[in-house]
Amino acid sequence: MSPLECSECFGDQLLHRTYTWQLTLHSRPNYTRKRDTRSESLEIPISVVLPQRGTAEPFPRLHNLYSTPRCAQQAALPRLSRRMASQHSYPLNRFSSVPLDPMERPMSQADLELDYNPPRVQLSDEMFVFQDGRWVNENCRLQSPYFSPSASFHHKLHHKRLAKECMLQEENKSLREENKALREENRMLSKENKILQVFWEEHKASLGREESRAPSPLLHKDSASLEVVKKDHVALQVPRGKEDSTLQLLREENRALQQLLEQKQAYWAQAEDTAAPAEESKPAPSPHEEPCSPGLLQDQGSGLSSRFEEPKGPPARQEDSKELRALRKMVSNMSGPSGEEEAKVGPGLPDGCQPLQLLREMRQALQALLKENRLLQEENRTLQVLRAEHRGFQEENKALWENNKLKLQQKLVIDTVTEVTARMEMLIEELYAFMPARSQDPKKPSRV
């Protein structure tokens, strides 16, 4: 080994020296292959640049043995053959395996910033790497404490990390897509839930309306008296300490009564609107209907119209006046004493007896109205049944009248035919009387 000086490799810095060692490797012939008894020898040049004492750079650096030579001395160095070329195109690894001074302790990679690509040899389909002064199989080699991981190892680690990151990104992307799909499905389900809730509320409201619909002519006619009761209840709804709970109950009852009144008014207005065109579309009774069934249709028509029209006649008016008087008396009993007692007692009542009494009376009145509502509903159903029967009777009477008319026409035709035949017989007899008697027994002609 002969050291060579190189002053042009690092930019005319004369304080650097370059040392080159020539390693020669002899291998035995491979007798396993037939006709292959050649021996192989490899020459490996190693060039190291070391600074002298007192230089500015504290660390030695290596030449890149496979780059373009920068000086004549470097160009004169022997090159590696093709079989000794590096198997990687990555930058040179850092090398600190061979100690420069055998008496000194080998320096670590942090102390020596040496770029070095370990030589590799491929023999019989196996790759060998020069490590720690000996050739080691690449698959079975161990990492030396003075050897840093190779570039391929770093590259593999980097690729493994990239692959893991790519896998994680793909998993995150798939999870985000699944989350997005689940959110869309959740939105659709929430919309369907809202639509179903709206339908359910509408269904409940329609059921409540059907149940609360009830004809109440008394409330329809005497709405003024109920308005007075409402005003009295509103006056009673002033907060008074102990009476707050009772007043709240009164408010709820008042709201229920208002809703019931509005529903009944709407129902009766609709019933009157439907009854008016039905009465207008009724066919006028023909004059021939009266002899067939004079009393049946008239009685049923009067009975039906009396329920849906305004009461006519003195008995109906007397009954309505009696009911109105009873209702007004009940309302006066509910509202009158409360006003007098409030005037006597004053704003602060010791206990809530008066509102409770008024609430009981209102409940009784509401129960009576509900009973009357049920009775009127039953009467309305019976009236509908009677109306259907009335229509059936009308059709039967019409058929009977047409049958009687046809019978009368048939009778008239028969009478006219008999009269014509009788006159023809009389004329034939007169003709035979004027004709001369040809024979004693003349034959009479047949009837025409």
From Swiss-Prot:
Residues annotated with Phosphoserine modification: 41, 86, 89, 97, 124, 144, 148, 150, 212, 225, 335, 338
Ranges of biased composition (kind: Basic and acidic residues): 279-291, 307-323
Stretches of the chain forming a coiled coil according to its record: 164-198, 242-267, 356-414
Pfam family, any one: Chibby
GO CC entries: cytoplasmic vesicle
Lineage: superkingdom: Eukaryota
Molecular function in Gene Ontology: identical protein binding
InterPro entries: Chibby_fam
Region of interest: Disordered: 270-323
Tissue spec: Testis-specific.
Assembly and binders: Homodimer. Binds to NEK1.
Family: Belongs to the chibby family. SPERT subfamily.
Name of the protein in its database record: Protein chibby homolog 2
Gene name of the record: CBY2
